[in-house]
UniProtKB/Swiss-Prot annotation:
Name assigned to this protein: DNA-directed RNA polymerase subunit beta'
Record GO biological process: DNA-templated transcription
Cofactor binding remark: Binds 1 Mg(2+) ion per subunit. Binds 2 Zn(2+) ions per subunit.
A family per Pfam: RNA_pol_Rpb1_3
Residues bound to Zn(2+) 2: C814, C888, C895, C898
Function of the molecule: DNA-dependent RNA polymerase catalyzes the transcription of DNA into RNA using the four ribonucleoside triphosphates as substrates.
Signal peptide coordinates: none
Quaternary assembly: The RNAP catalytic core consists of 2 alpha, 1 beta, 1 beta' and 1 omega subunit. When a sigma factor is associated with the core the holoenzyme is formed, which can initiate transcription.
Lyase is among the record's keywords: no
InterPro entries: DNA-dir_RpoC_beta_prime (IPR045867), DNA-dir_RpoC_beta_prime_bact (IPR012754), RNA_pol_asu (IPR000722), RNA_pol_N (IPR006592), RNA_pol_Rpb1_1 (IPR007080), RNA_pol_Rpb1_3 (IPR007066), RNA_pol_Rpb1_3_sf (IPR042102), RNA_pol_Rpb1_4 (IPR007083)
One GO cellular component term: DNA-directed RNA polymerase complex
CDD domains: RNAP_beta'_C, RNAP_beta'_N
Gene name of the record: rpoC
Length: 1410
């Protein structure tokens, strides 16, 4: 009978599944998994090594130990398969069933599952609305809980201690029911009417006022609703049957010497079985209650330890004092099931070896040692040998290979021809860390690597190792060739610039050959072609650097891509002409006719790629490498001690600095400067001295004086070896040369503070003992930092990948009308990034018109390539709106138009591209280059902080943004609004410079006026904030009582008197309620109103204000009424580098953050409390007023009566991204995070495209909180996917119902990863227990849409080449479901098998009973 079933089963295919559901298992389900009950704690017999019957390894329950053989040996071999032995009860089948057959234990008492009890928030506690502490006391038999209060005055869910219970019994006898232990909790859960409770709670949530209570009730509603929808019963959180893992997943292995190695789970299971059996016996014997209770508690503890050891109480330890590894520990953490086995698998067919340089290789080749290739390509060689009939069997082929017969090498040559291999270098930080090459067989044992791919791998040849992987199938080879080949990856996915850029000796060689030299041999010759130049050079008739005139043939591509030639006679050098020979047609000569540094070579490759395409660029890169190596060798550059030239001025500069330091020490001793001022000044002096020495040294090194033929003295760039290396970008920098030939300068202590005695010596002179000791500080800190940095950077990358892993391009155009405004980044007089650089590769949202006419220059939905960007620049366009992933309206994934250009390919991105992972890698990969430093601003940096004027760099026209101003009595303009931006525009109206101007600045020129370069146009006092009047009139003092609210001071030196307002803390009781103010009144004491409002001109003065006017004085608008001193801030810490990036992506609130105005309105101050000020904002339209308490030590930027806009800064400080989102919207928070992250990377000279950061921001913004649910099913205060809300609102709008209102949330990347829809992805990231608990209770379904989930279930990922596969599967599934509906009448093989198996099971059950 079973054989027939097997026959049916052979035809049965694995059922296609498209989602995985997780839910609570009921006792019935657990029993249905089981193949029998385990009754004994025994494992195996120590003599026979056979499993004990009914024990943890029982063969009757779990299956035979040997294939097709029962335990007693009665039935052996395949012919008896399916038979159950009468003697030992073992089914004759394969032994691998021991990997998937489960058993179970019938528990003598119900036990609470620790995950649902202790994993916060406790599910059982939330459901019963009882504190966790009380539930634990009930479960561990310390207290009773009322399960049925009857007609007594006790309440259900009330917890009673032993004494209270006895007292209640005396009072009420048996009118009520109270229990303890898990049965009590099970009873409560069973008797819960979920639907009724849910209805009551939904009514209650509307009445609740307190925010915390509302949150709690909402949580309960969500939990109850999820239980109802998932059909999970709450009592299933209490176990009555415990499943047992299949024995082969918790093996017991005999070691030599009669000992056993076992999985910890066996110990834990034995403990449970022992205690369970003991409890059964005690219950049968009707043992005293106290003993039974103790046994039940011990059983509860044993099961807790099995499920999650250490979650409650002390961990159970094994014989070696090590905590036992429970089921929960098996799946969580780096060594857990998810990260160790499902996401990180080992790869077969791989080898690894040291790498060495292969300067003669082509870009698509790598050298593989013959021995290695022979081993790796074995299967292919065997196949070929058999195919050619050179070997009859695999065995003989194996022998031939082992003997290394000559024919084998020929076959190997054939096999590896056009068979790509993958080379990988750990750590693989971005996708270019693994690339494909064509193998070339070489002698030796090291892999040879092409020098140009080193940058992508971050490899060098100081002992680095690389791994080789062989793609086996035809499709894998095809994929490696078309996508992963090194020649296909010449642009970096992070910024779209070439990553195949020559470095070091190649750069040196090319720089050397393109340098020019005056008085060279054969100068001013006329040559007919570059070929002739090369010939003359080889004859020795001319020098490589001689300036000559040569006829150059240039080819230019026209619109139809045809080449047209052009002849020119050009003044150039011999070296440049020789280089031109190897350049492909179609490039202009002007980009080669200069001294080529590293950046120029990168530009050349970029231009070549855009103009001539991939193949020619690869060829050019290779040619440049060969030439570079050749001429680097010919140049004979090497470093000699005499190349390090110490400037003569050094001694003088150091002497001067020491003199100044002594002067400051004197001032300190006489008390003129404070200790911190002295320290800052000393450090400043040395920093400036160091700069001066460096300048003198570089001047000295970089130029040499030579005589022309006419005896005229001229300077030319020097050929000093060290200078050549630094100038070309091959090795070293000005900062390093400074240490060799200048002075080492200031050193930092490990805590980041600067040691004030600098090292005045350099390495050429040598350091003395003290100097050497000081410099070890920095060196050690550097090493320690590097180790920390690597770990931190890796963790950041992991979090980024996790949050963005499911973002894939799923659609071409989402047709959104939204976009982000892009303009040039200008800080002061410097352009940080031009508009062209920022919008390259983006898509326009709307038509772009000519500035003066209505002609469309660029139509909407255009991909801005280099050509369009040049048009933008020509037409002087300052800012445009482009599409961005932040605003993409695709519900799952992103659309190609919102993403724009695929940076690594230079074309619009294709469907299926995993843009999320690329973004995460691009941001994470340079992480190791960032610093871990926290900068202390002091000394040199603090000078910048106190600027007091603005000097213009270029001629232009002034433009003021959002500025309110008045004219003062001297006719100057005074700014009376905050956050004013002053821009300098050129003739075309394009911004050239941009400055921030504080309140109270005095401008010499006004809006629209012309200014000349070098003019100072704004001045202000950096140490005080002025209070400025907007009207003319007379002063009237209000609430200014000497000794109570103010005090008068006389300055002895100047003889001037001033009035100082006392701070509230300094006033006596009588002065506390006084509000000192200056009111401006007319001649007849009438009120004067502030222009544009109906508010009288009255200026309240904050504490410590200094007033230099007298009561009744006449004043005019723009005059300063009072000054508020700004407290001088000490050294500030600025978080920089990697920690700053992590803070931004985690959306952490900064300490002492800026306080922003929550609404538009007028500022006033209410009654103060101890240590806090009450700020009141009164809206102009008469809506509700807004109040906020602000600590008194915070310096406020606003005065009473001032009008502020929503989002304006009230108190300075770092802004919180959450506030920016709430008050200024998505666009503002995107700009803020992008600019702040870019700031950190820009400092290190790392280029990352904005769109990568935007991709991460999109993921951080994917949740929103419901404010008013309207007619939707959402709950108030619930956090839901933004895309879900928008689609729901569309439906509601269609049906003319009330839509839900919501506010966008900004989640940190860790939170966003855990809040993803997919529980598999979240569980494999962090907090596995919590995620799985939550998912199980809610009966969550994972639709397997992201990349991680598909890797875990072992499928191709739905991105890249797997994207088509998933689309195809979807089509087939829809097709099959249609076919199934049509063929419902005819019975399928599967159904027949199912019916038969049901029949068999019933007979099998009868046999078991007998």
């Amino acid at each position: 009978m079973k054989d027939i079933l097997k026959l049916f089963k052979k035809n049965k295919k694995v059922e296609e599944f498209d989602s995985i559901k997780i839910s609570l298992a009921s006792p019935e389900v657990i029993r249905s998994w089981s193949f029998g009950e385990v009754k004994k704690p025994e494992t195996i017999n120590y003599r026979t090594l056979n499993p004990e019957r009914d024990g943890l390894f029982c063969a009757r329950i779990f299956g035979p130990i040997k294939d097709y053989e029962c335990l007693c040996g009665k039935y052996k071999r395949l012919k008896h398969r399916g038979v159950i032995c009468e003697k030992c009860g073992v089914e004759v089948t394969q032994s691998k069933v021991r990997r998937d057959r489960m058993g179970h234990i019938e528990l003598a008492a119900p036990i609470a599952h620790i995950w649902f009890l202790k994993s916060l928030p406790s599910r059982i506690g939330l459901l019963l609305d009882m504190p966790l502490r009380d539930i634990e006391r009930v479960l561990y038999f310390e207290s009773y809980v009322i399960t049925d209060p009857g007609i007594t005055n006790l309440e259900k869910y009330q917890v009673l201690s032993e004494d209270q219970y006895i007292q209640a019994l005396e009072e009420n006898e048996d009118e009520f029911e109270a229990k303890m232990g898990a049965e009590a909790i099970q009873n409560l859960l069973k008797n819960m009417d979920l639907k009724k409770t849910c209805k009551i709670l939904k009514k209650e949530v509307l009445k609740v006022n307190s925010e915390t209570k509302r949150k709690k009730v909402t949580k309960r509603i969500k939990l109850i609703e999820s239980l109802l929808t998932s059909k999970n019963k709450p009592e299933w959180m209490i176990l009555t049957v415990l499943p047992i893992l299949p024995p082969d997943l918790r093996p017991l292995v005999p070691l030599d010497g009669g000992r056993f190695a076992t999985s910890d789970l066996n110990d834990l299971y034995r403990r449970v079985i022992n205690r369970n059996n003991r409890l059964k016996r005690l219950l049968e014997l009707f043992a005293p209650e106290i003993i039974v209770r103790n046994e039940k508690r011990m059983l509860q503890e044993a099961i807790d330890a099995l499920l999650d050891n250490g979650r409650r109480g002390r961990s159970i330890t094994g014989s070696n004092k090590r905590p036992l590894k429970s089921l929960a520990d098996m799946i969580k953490g780096k060594q857990g099931r998810f990260r160790q086995n499902l996401l990180g698998k080992r790869v077969d067919y791989s080898g690894r070896s040291v790498i060495t340089v292969g300067p003669y290789l082509h870009l698509n080749q790598c050298g593989i040692p013959k021995k290695m290739a022979l081993e790796l390509f074995k299967p292919f060689i065997y196949g070929k040998l058999e195919q050619r009939n050179l070997a009859t069997t695999i065995k003989s082929a194996k022998k031939m290979v082992e003997k290394e017969e000559p024919i084998v090498w020929d076959i190997l040559d054939e096999v590896i021809h056009k068979h790509p291999i993958l080379l990988n270098r750990a750590p693989t930080l971005h996708r270019l860390g693994i690339q494909a090459f064509e193998p070339i067989l070489i002698e030796g044992k090291a892999i040879q690597l092409h020098p140009l791919v080193c940058a992508a791998y971050n490899a060098d040849f100081d002992g680095d190792q690389m791994a080789i992987h062989i793609p086996l199938t035809k499709t894998a080879q095809k994929e490696a060739c078309s996508l992963m080949m090194s020649t296909k990856n010449i642009l970096s996915p992070a910024n779209g610039e070439p990553i195949i850029v020559p470095s070091q000796d190649v750069v040196l060689g090319i720089y050397y050959m393109t340098r020019k030299k005056i008085n060279g041999k054969g100068e001013n010759m006329l040559l007919s072609s570059p070929k002739e130049a090369e010939y003359m050079y080889s004859l020795g008739a001319v020098d490589l650097h001689s300036i000559v005139k040569i006829r150059i043939l240039e080819y230019k591509k026209d619109e139809k891509k045809n080449l047209t030639e052009k002849k020119k006679i050009i003044k150039t050098t011999i070296g440049r002409a020789i280089l031109w020979i190897h350049v492909p047609m179609g490039l202009p000569f002007k980009i080669f006719n200069k001294t080529l540094r590293k950046s120029h070579i990168s530009e050349i490759l970029n231009t070549c790629y855009r103009l001539l395409g991939l193949k020619k660029t690869v060829r050019l890169a290779d040619q440049m490498m060969y030439i570079g190596f050749s001429y680097a060798a010919k140049s004979g550059v090497s470093v000699g001690i005499n190349d390090i030239i110490i400037p003569k001025e050094k001694e003088k500069i150091i002497f001067q600095a020491e003199k100044e330091v002594l002067e400051i020490d004197k001032q300190f001793q006489t008390g003129l400067v404070t200790s911190s001022e002295r320290y800052n000044k000393v450090i400043d002096i040395w920093a400036i001295a160091n700069e001066n020495i460096a300048d003198a040294m570089m001047k000295n090194l970089s130029y040499e004086i030579i005589f022309q033929k006419n005896k005229k003295k001229i300077t030319q760039k020097s050929f000093n070896n060290i200078f050549i290396m630094a100038d070309s970008g091959a090795r070293g920098s000005a900062a390093q040369i400074r240490q060799l030939a200048g002075m080492r300068g200031l050193m930092a202590k490990p805590d980041g503070s600067i040691i004030e005695t600098p090292i005045t010596a350099n390495f050429r002179e040598g350091l003395n003992v003290l100097q050497y000791f000081i410099s070890t500080h920095g060196a050690r800190k550097g090493l320690a930092d590097t180790a920390l940095k690597t770990a931190n950077s890796g963790y950041l990358t992991r979090r980024l990948v996790d949050v963005a892993q499911d973002l894939v391009i799923t659609q071409t155009n989402c047709k959104t009308k939204k976009g982000i405004l892009m303009n040039s980044l200008i800080e002061g007089g410097d352009i940080k990034e031009t508009l062209k650089e920022r919008v390259l590769g983006r898509i326009t949202v709307e038509n772009i018109y000519h500035l003066n006419s209505k002609n469309i220059i660029i139509p909407k939905n255009t991909l801005l390539n280099e050509k369009w960007c040049n048009i933008l620049e020509k037409n002087f366009i300052d800012s445009i709106i482009v599409r961005s992933v932040v605003h993409c309206e695709t519900s799952f994934g992103v659309c190609a138009y919102c993403y724009g250009r695929d940076l690594a390919r230079g074309k619009i991105v294709k469907k299926g591209e995993a843009v999320g992972v690329i973004a995460a890698q691009s941001i994470g990969e340079p992480g190791t280059q960032l610093t871990m430093r926290t900068f202390h601003i002091g000394g040199a940096a603090s000078k910048v902080a106190s600027e007091s004027s603005i000097q213009i760099r270029k001629n232009g026209i002034i433009h003021l943004n959002q500025a309110k101003s008045v004219i003062n009595s001297n006719g100057k303009i005074v700014i009376i609004s905050r956050n004013v931006e002053l821009k300098m525009l050129d003739k075309t109206g394009k911004t050239q410079e941009s400055y921030k101007i504080p309140y109270g600045s005095i401008l010499t020129k006004g809006e629209g006026q012309k200014v000349k370069a070098g003019e100072i146009i704004a001045k202000w006092d950096p140490h005080t904030i002025p209070v400025i009047t907007e009207v003319n009139g007379y002063i009237k003092f209000i609430d200014m009582v000497d000794g109570k609210s103010i005090t008068k001071q006389n300055d002895e030196l100047t003889g001037l008197s001033s009035i100082v307002v006392l701070d509230i803390s300094e006033r006596n009781i009588l002065g506390k309620d006084l509000k000192p103010a200056l009111k401006i009144i007319g001649k007849n004491e009438e009120d004067i109103f502030i222009p544009g409002t109906d508010m009288p001109a009255q200026y309240f003065l904050p504490g410590k204000s200094i007033i230099l006017l007298e009561d009744g004085m006449k004043i005019s608008s723009g005059d300063i009424l009072a000054r508020v001193p700004q407290e001088s801030v000490g050294t500030k810490d600025i978080t920089g580098g990697l920690p700053r990036v992590a803070d931004l992506f985690e959306a952490r609130k900064p300490k002492e953050l800026a306080i922003l105005a929550e609404i538009n309105g007028i500022v006033s101050f209410g009654k103060e409390t101890k240590g806090k000020r009450r700020l009141i904002l009164t809206p102009i339209d008469g809506n509700n007023i807004y109040e906020e308490m602000i600590p008194k030590w915070r310096q406020l930027n606003v005065f009473e009566g001032e009008r502020v806009e929503k989002g304006d800064i009230i108190s300075d400080g770092p802004e919180s991204p959450h506030d920016i989102l709430r008050l200024r919207g998505v666009q503002a928070v995107t700009n803020y995070i992008v600019n702040e992250v870019q700031e950190v990377y820009r400092l290190q000279g790392v280029k990352i495209n904005d769109k990568h950061i935007e991709v991460i921001i999109r993921q951080m913004l994917r949740k929103a909180t419901i404010i008013n649910p309207g007619d939707s099913n959402f709950l108030q205060g619930e956090q839901i996917e933004y895309s879900k809300i928008t689609s729901e609102n569309k439906k509601l709008k269609k049906n003319k119902k009330e839509t839900a209102t919501f506010s966008r949330d900004l989640l940190g990347i860790t939170k966003a990863s855990l809040a993803t829809e997919s529980f598999i992805s979240a569980a494999s990231f962090q907090e596995t227990t919590r995620v799985l608990t939550e998912a199980a209770v809610a009966g969550k379904k994972d639709k397997l849409r992201g990349l991680k989930e598909n890797v875990i279930v072992g499928r191709l990922i739905p991105a890249g080449t797997g994207y088509k596969y998933h689309k195809k599967r979807l089509k087939n599934r829809i097709k099959n479901s249609v076919n199934k509906k049509n063929n419902m009448s005819s019975i399928s093989v599967e159904e027949a098998a199912a019916n038969l198996s049901e029949l068999l099971n019933s007979t099998e059950n009868i046999n078991n009973r007998i």
